[in-house]
Amino acid sequence: MAETQRPRSAIIVGAGAGGIAVAARLAKAGVDVTVLEKNDFTGGRCSLIHTKAGYRFDQGPSLLLLPGLFRETFEDLGTTLEQEDVELLQCFPNYNIWFSDGKRFSPTTDNATMKVEIEKWEGPDGFRRYLSWLAEGHQHYETSLRHVLHRNFKSILELADPRLVVTLLMALHPFESIWHRAGRYFKTDRMQRVFTFATMYMGMSPFDAPATYSLLQYSELAEGIWYPRGGFHKVLDALVKIGERMGVKYRLNTGVSQVLTDGGKNGKKPKATGVQLENGEVLNADLVVVNADLVYTYNNLLPKEIGGIKKYANKLNNRKASCSSISFYWSLSGMAKELETHNIFLAEEYKESFDAIFERQALPDDPSFYIHVPSRVDPSAAPPDRDAVIALVPVGHLLQNGQPELDWPTLVSKARAGVLATIQARTGLSLSPLITEEIVNTPYTWETKFNLSKGAILGLAHDFFNVLAFRPRTKAQGMDNAYFVGASTHPGTGVPIVLAGAKITAEQILEETFPKNTKVPWTTNEERNSERMRKEMDEKITEEGIIMRSNSSKPGRRGSDAFEGAMEVVNLLSQRAFPLLVALMGVLYFLLFVR
């Protein structure tokens, strides 16, 4: 394809959140897009389970966080959630969080309620400390949006910017665990638990996860937790329809066996030329975007004869993965009125429960778990006067290292008994007699149904050396016209994060494969960041603690001024000190991921 010629066609492998979103974006740019999906449904993990008796379950995600990223996706495509008949229902309270003695805490976006609840546990100055913690979460949130979720990291050289690196280190606290960081603000062990468990959204222990991820609970407490009427898949179904209006074609029940290339011509990198289906059919295209699990893709779909792919696949196999889950989907003959839409049951042995998952890849003896009752906020999820209940129990991922796998049937029975006993002990609800039908997803289910390596439901982990420029690239190693979108590539896991990644991937494709000076048909990340910086540079802390707090040591000086002052010092030092830092990071990256 000549450099001046735009790609006419694209194949997307996988109809998960990222594949659906990038398909619509490329179609808006004028590309003829075909999406291939091995299952008979779209949405990937973000799909629905329906029973003949009229119950509906969210198979995967059930909490809609970071609503701004969803709205941004729809607006970039020339529409809105409301225009596409997506109704978001806010959950009040956010959760009920149950402790082992039957006491509970119910976080909410209402600060007056939070003041009363927090001071019960933390004393008279507890709410002030909570506001300070919330302000820091806002800082993590805004910095991440601007410098991580709206920015591509095509190589380690992307970090060769002293202002960026110092911003990330100063503003995101990446080398301090969220558990330790929370201890700076909360005196009681229980409040530390309340404000750290959300790292499980990233498939990580709060004792290992960077403090950066307090942005998740900031989002919950500042923006709320939402649920789309009709199920989480309603959002992705709307994106499918938007894409179809622009010409995107979906082929379900269509498995892909390999990505094809031209083999490389005249000493150039091989280019992706299409795919071969499991039935042997060959489909040609100018470019290929893979939304399948990235570790699975490198091991099974990309040609191993291309230099570096086999070696990189082996490296990915040894990267730290997120957890898996045993998920129960229960149809009830009545209503579980003791349960809210979202319920968290925290283990008494909090740290030990995470160690069992992430260090021993096992089921904890006393697990923390999540209960979702979609029919509490959206009655259409179950027949009248009945409830649909989902119990998600985090567990270790499959080993796949030559060691014997755990006895998962026994662990499923143990998990079920533990969940039912804990619910009854803490709430008084005897759930077992109400269950009329059960569906179970185990780590093996996640692996086989969605091609998730090791059954890890959230892809690769999100520790420091698995994010930013250290996370797998959005473009395939050693190939042209082959790209990725999804949980294990940049910027990371979770539906809103993957939607942000779809924008990053689409913009990279337009930059690298379209003629120069081609106008991107939406507000680009660069343009959005510039606008955000203009609007937010002078924000100040408010009484509610929602605005970024000043870190200035000089009375009367705003945080943005102090930060700019720090940047001036950084600029003065960068000519001598920073090249050494970049060199050291490059050596470390080579030792960890290349050698």
UniProtKB/Swiss-Prot annotation:
Residues spanning the signal sequence: 1-23
Keyword Membrane tagged: yes
Induction text: The expression is subject to photoinduction.
SUPFAM superfamilies (alphabetical): FAD/NAD(P)-binding domain
Location relative to the cell: Membrane
A cellular component annotation (GO) from this entry: membrane
Keywords assigned by UniProt, alphabetized: Carotenoid biosynthesis, Membrane, NAD, Oxidoreductase, Signal, Transmembrane, Transmembrane helix
Cofactors (names): NAD(+)
Keyword Amino-acid biosynthesis tagged: no
An example molecular function term from Gene Ontology annotations: phytoene dehydrogenase activity
Enzyme Commission number: 1.3.99.-
Pathway field: Carotenoid biosynthesis; lycopene biosynthesis
Database matches in InterPro entries: Amino_oxidase, Carotenoid/retinoid_OxRdtase, FAD/NAD-bd_sf, Phytoene_DH_bac_CS
GO terms (BP aspect): carotenoid biosynthetic process
Coiled coil regions in record: none
Membrane topology qualifier: Single-pass membrane protein
Ranges that cross the membrane: 574-594
Record field: catalytic activity: 15-cis-phytoene + A = all-trans-phytofluene + AH2; all-trans-phytofluene + A = all-trans-zeta-carotene + AH2; all-trans-zeta-carotene + A = all-trans-neurosporene + AH2; all-trans-neurosporene + A = all-trans-lycopene + AH2
Family statement drawn from the similarity comment of this UniProt entry: Belongs to the carotenoid/retinoid oxidoreductase family.
Described purpose of this protein according to its UniProt entry: Phytoene desaturase involved in the carotenoid biosynthesis pathway. Converts phytoene into 3,4-didehydrolycopene via the intermediates phytofluene, zeta-carotene, neurosporene and lycopene, by introducing up to five double bonds into phytoene. Is also able to desaturate 1-hydroxyneurosporene into 1-hydroxylycopene and 1-hydroxylycopene into 1-hydroxy-3,4-didehydrolycopene. Gamma-carotene and 1,19-dihydroxylycopene are not accepted as substrates. Neurosporaxanthin is synthesized from geranyl-geranyl pyrophosphate (GGPP) through several enzymatic activities.
PANTHER family, A to Z: PHYTOENE DESATURASE
Name by which UniProt lists this protein: Phytoene desaturase
Gene: al-1
